[in-house]
């Protein structure tokens, strides 16, 4: 009986610890504040991110993000974009901003996706504040968890 109590205690603590490390990626991304700065290359003002301390602490760590596939054809074709919102909600028309999209660099090609496929990916978070050719939230070495 005593060993059953210890096992139950251990399992409940393990479950609690796992729950504590799970994050809502989109919610964390949404805490990012943006400020306009002049971007010389384009000759106009663009919004640059000020990442939170909590988000900076996640950089380089593996996170999971679930989002909708956005049809985007980069010239080199080695990454995809997912959004918190489906295209049918027109994420770029006002409901979402730069905090609602993530760039996914797969470790191996996962196959083809259709517009608004809801996918879950896992990868190492990279925060991008300066390269305007890419989005602010990037998952490197990503793998497809579910489609």
What do these predicted ranges mean?
Residues 4-14:
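Sec-dependent N-terminal signal peptides
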């Amino acid at each position: 009986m005593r060993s059953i109590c210890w096992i139950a205690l251990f399992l409940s603590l393990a479950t609690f610890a796992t729950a504590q490390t799970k994050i809502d990626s989109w919610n964390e991304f949404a805490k990012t504040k943006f400020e306009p700065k002049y971007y010389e290359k384009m000759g106009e003002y663009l919004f640059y991110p000020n990442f939170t301390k909590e988000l900076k602490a996640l950089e380089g760590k593996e996170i999971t993000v679930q989002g909708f596939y956005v049809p985007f054809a980069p010239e080199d074709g080695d990454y995809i974009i997912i959004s918190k919102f489906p295209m049918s909600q027109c994420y770029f028309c006002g409901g979402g901003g730069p905090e609602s999209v993530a760039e996914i660099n797969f470790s191996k090609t996962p196959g083809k996706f259709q517009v608004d496929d809801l996918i879950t990916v896992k990868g190492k978070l990279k925060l991008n504040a300066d390269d305007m050719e890419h989005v602010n939230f990037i998952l490197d070495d990503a793998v497809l968890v579910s489609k």
